[in-house]
Amino acid sequence: DCCGVKLEMCHPCLCDNSCKNYGK
């Protein structure tokens, strides 16, 4: 996975503090 979400949902900001809730 990517930052706890499926690879299909992986996005550059997923690991960024400003977008840490993206895809949660």
UniProtKB/Swiss-Prot annotation:
In terms of domain of life, where is this protein from? Eukaryota
Say if the entry is tagged with keyword ATP-binding: no
Q: Note whether Secreted occurs among the keywords.
A: yes
Give each disulfide bond as a residue pair. Answer: C2-C10, C3-C15, C13-C19
Q: Which GO terms describe its molecular function?
A: ion channel regulator activity; toxin activity
Entry's family note? Belongs to the conotoxin A superfamily.
Q: What does this protein do?
A: Probable neurotoxin with ion channel inhibitor activity. In vivo, elicits dose-dependently excitatory activity upon injection into fish. Its action is slowly reversible.
In the record's own words, the domains note is: The cysteine framework is IV (CC-C-C-C-C).
**Protein name, UniProt field:** Conotoxin PIVE
- The record lists the organism as Conus purpurascens (Purple cone)
